[in-house]
């Protein structure tokens, strides 16, 4: 399973670790992804999404029905 948020599209980024001596070694910054179940009232079922914590906050703000409609319009299976 890829490390991509289904709502925001956040993906891993690359950057550098920096030691005290300012040596640079490559590293990945991973999004804070959570597997989360959301209750869809209109369909009377749970939907499991892999979302970042920012995606969870967006769902709290917009509502799960709106977000699922956007995902389906994008062609994602929910």
From Swiss-Prot:
Cellular component aspect of the GO annotation: cytosolic large ribosomal subunit
Lineage start: Bacteria, Pseudomonadati, Pseudomonadota, Gammaproteobacteria, Alteromonadales
Top-level division of the source organism's lineage: Bacteria
Gene Ontology terms for molecular function: structural constituent of ribosome
Region (Disordered) location: 1-21
Protein name as catalogued: Large ribosomal subunit protein bL28
Protein family: Belongs to the bacterial ribosomal protein bL28 family.
Gene: rpmB
Keyword Ribonucleoprotein: yes
Alphabetical list of SUPFAM superfamilies matching this protein: L28p-like (SSF143800)
Keywords: Ribonucleoprotein, Ribosomal protein
Any one Gene Ontology BP term: translation
InterPro entries listed in its UniProt record: Ribosomal_bL28, Ribosomal_bL28/bL31-like_sf, Ribosomal_bL28_bact-type, Ribosomal_bL28_sf
Species annotation: Shewanella baltica (strain OS155 / ATCC BAA-1091)
């Amino acid at each position: 399973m890829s490390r991509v948020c289904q709502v925001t599209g956040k993906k891993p980024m690359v950057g550098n670790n920096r030691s005290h001596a300012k040596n640079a070694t490559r590293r990945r910054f991973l999004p804070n992804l959570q597997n989360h179940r959301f209750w869809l009232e209109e369909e009377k079922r749970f939907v499991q999404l892999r979302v970042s914590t920012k995606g969870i906050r967006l769902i709290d703000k917009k509502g799960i029905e709106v977000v699922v409609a956007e995902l389906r319009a994008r062609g994602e299976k929910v």
